Amino acid sequence: QFRRGLRPVRNLAAEAARAQSEGDELCCLRVSGSYAEADFSGLDFDRVLFENCRFTKCSFNGCSFHTAAFADSDISNCDFGEARFIGCVFHGAKGVGTAFTGSRFEKTRFGSCGMSYANFGRCRMVKCRLDASDFSDASFSEAEFREPALRESVFVRTDFFRTPLRGIDFTTCRLEGLTLSETASELRGAVVGAGQAIELAKMFGLIVR
């Protein structure tokens, strides 16, 4: 249903250049193709489907995405700093080392994504879902979560420094080797299972019998 009424685009760079020169938004597009070191910064994307795309070191800095979807696309090492995502979906997306620093996510879902080494530092996530995705070695330093839903996702060596995790249910997720402050105050009020609690206790030199 999302695909209905979308215009196929195989040259996003040309569409972006036109939109930037005219101060227009990019709306109702179905984007495909490969793009390297392209500058899409500051653009507004409304109801745009990025399907089977490959972006290499591209800049989406300061972009706004409304009801957009990244499906089976590779956005590794791209810059989405200070971007805004509202009602968006990342499904089967690969974002290794991608920078989302200072971005805002509202009612956005990550499903079956590979986001290892991605930087979500200082980002804000409101009513977002992180489903069956890998955030190993990713950074959520000084981030903010409001009413998140986490399911079967991986957080191995993930950085949550100065990010309150109170009320977040990690029971179906994998937690190992987290980066926290010395007091681990970030974990206060977080919901974890018994096995996870034992693993977390090891981080502080505790021996659980």
Regions inferred by a protein language model and the residue ranges of each:
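Tandem repeat scaffolds
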Residues: 2-209
